[in-house]
Curated annotation (Swiss-Prot):
<protein>
    <recommendedName>
        <fullName>Petrobactin import system permease protein FatD</fullName>
    </recommendedName>
</protein>
<keyword id="KW-1003">Cell membrane</keyword>
<keyword id="KW-0472">Membrane</keyword>
<comment type="subunit">
    <text>The complex is composed of two ATP-binding proteins (FatE), two transmembrane proteins (FatC and FatD) and a solute-binding protein (FpuA).</text>
</comment>
<dbReference type="GO" id="GO:0033214">
    <property type="term" value="P:siderophore-dependent iron import into cell"/>
</dbReference>
<feature type="transmembrane region" description="Helical">
    <location>
        <begin position="304"/>
        <end position="324"/>
    </location>
</feature>
<keyword id="KW-1133">Transmembrane helix</keyword>
<keyword id="KW-0408">Iron</keyword>
<dbReference type="GO" id="GO:0005886">
    <property type="term" value="C:plasma membrane"/>
</dbReference>
<feature type="transmembrane region" description="Helical">
    <location>
        <begin position="152"/>
        <end position="172"/>
    </location>
</feature>
<feature type="transmembrane region" description="Helical">
    <location>
        <begin position="277"/>
        <end position="297"/>
    </location>
</feature>
<feature type="transmembrane region" description="Helical">
    <location>
        <begin position="119"/>
        <end position="139"/>
    </location>
</feature>
<feature type="transmembrane region" description="Helical">
    <location>
        <begin position="197"/>
        <end position="217"/>
    </location>
</feature>
<comment type="function">
    <text>Part of an ABC transporter complex involved in ferric-petrobactin uptake. Probably responsible for the translocation of the substrate across the membrane.</text>
</comment>
<feature type="transmembrane region" description="Helical">
    <location>
        <begin position="234"/>
        <end position="254"/>
    </location>
</feature>
<keyword id="KW-0813">Transport</keyword>
<dbReference type="Pfam" id="PF01032">
    <property type="entry name" value="FecCD"/>
</dbReference>
Length: 334
């Protein structure tokens, strides 16, 4: 078992066979509305312009698609991480995974002066996997009495890796690039710069296919093994999928903090922790959350644009503190 912690962090399972319920359909409609608002939000007014339609398909459509795919990826990564570690406070931001992916990007730039997007993604994915496995191995060797210790350990590990990245950046005069990676923004997304995000769809399908095994892994090593699941193999597989999702997002977008913490916890409050039935909910709410934050980032100080990571960090911090302080009673959506 990766960690033994207080009951607050333990998964709670409910049977939800129906996906297309009234609340889920309403959630999809809300996300579609947010997507439409995103398509027509920006400094450049595409209406009535000669090149309006061209700009619409070159910049607005790719940005909105990137928002949807990225929101689903990071929320999904947080959900799988929380199941594997049996801790509700774990996600790529609180495990150091994002910092490891940034370190991977730095090493790619050190090896290849002008790396391609594929090379950047490969470096980010490999380092994300290594960093996440180091975090998981540490949890397996240390008995923790409180669930709160787990994210603290992850944040400390992330701080160390961030310091290493900063040192290497200063040493090789790459501090500006590092600052860019640590700030997630969709401002530069356009045709030709986001297409690899479609790989997230494959990751989502794989997670859905292995959802039952990942859910059993969330019960702990002893229970999962007794039910015929190869615990170590499924944890390794889940970690690989998380690393692919986080690595792609890090290379294309940058750091998007707390999204994997906010969404899975909101969903689990109402639906428990069954991965197969929760995955559509997590993806949809993840899409809506990041799209709403991006719309705010584009309009709050218009005509200027804030990095969406700043909005996410602010919202995520409030939600994180609320989760720590609130005694939650799961309710079921009907």
């Amino acid at each position: 078992m990766i960690s033994r912690v207080e009951n607050i962090s333990q998964p709670q399972f409910y049977n939800h066979n129906k996906i297309w319920t009234k609340p889920f359909i309403i959630a999809i409609i809300v996300v579609i509305i947010l997507g439409i608002i995103s398509l027509f939000t920006g400094v450049y007014d595409i209406r009535g312009q000669e090149d309006g339609m061209e700009m619409f398909f070159i910049t607005r459509v790719p940005r909105t698609v990137a928002l949807m795919l990225t929101g689903a990826a990071m929320a999904m990564a947080g959900l799988v991480m929380q199941l594997i570690t049996q801790n509700r406070f774990v996600e790529p931001t609180t495990t150091g995974t994002i910092e490891w992916s940034s370190l991977g990007l730095l090493f790619v730039y050190l090896l290849f002066p002008a790396p391609t997007l594929v090379q950047r993604m490969t470096g980010a994915i490999i380092f994300s996997f290594i960093g996440t496995m180091i975090f998981f191995l540490f949890l397996r060797r240390v008995k923790l009495r409180s669930s709160l210790i787990v994210p603290i350990i992850g944040l400390m590990l992330g701080a160390v890796i961030s310091a290493v990245s900063t040192f290497l950046g200063l040493l090789f005069q790459m501090t500006q690039s590092i600052e860019t990676w640590f700030v997630g923004s969709f401002a530069n997304i356009q045709v030709g710069r986001y297409e690899y995000l479609w790989l997230i769809v494959i990751v989502t399908l794989l997670i859905f296919m292995y959802a039952n095994r990942l859910t059993l892994a969330g019960l702990g090593e002893d229970v999962a093994t007794s039910l015929g699941v190869n615990y170590n193999r499924i944890v390794l597989f889940g970690t690989a999928l998380i690393s692919v999702a986080v690595g792609i997002v890090a290379a294309v977008i940058g750091n998007l903090p707390f999204l994997g913490l906010i969404v899975p916890n909101i969903v689990s409050m109402f639906r428990g922790d069954d991965l197969r039935s929760n995955l559509p909910w997590v993806c949809v709410i993840g899409m809506g959350t990041i799209t709403a934050c991006d719309i705010i980032s584009r309009t709050i100080i218009k005509p200027f644009e804030l990095p969406v990571s700043l909005i996410l960090a602010s919202v995520g911090a409030v939600v994180f503190i609320t989760i720590l302080l609130r005694k939650r009673k799961p309710r079921r959506l009907r």
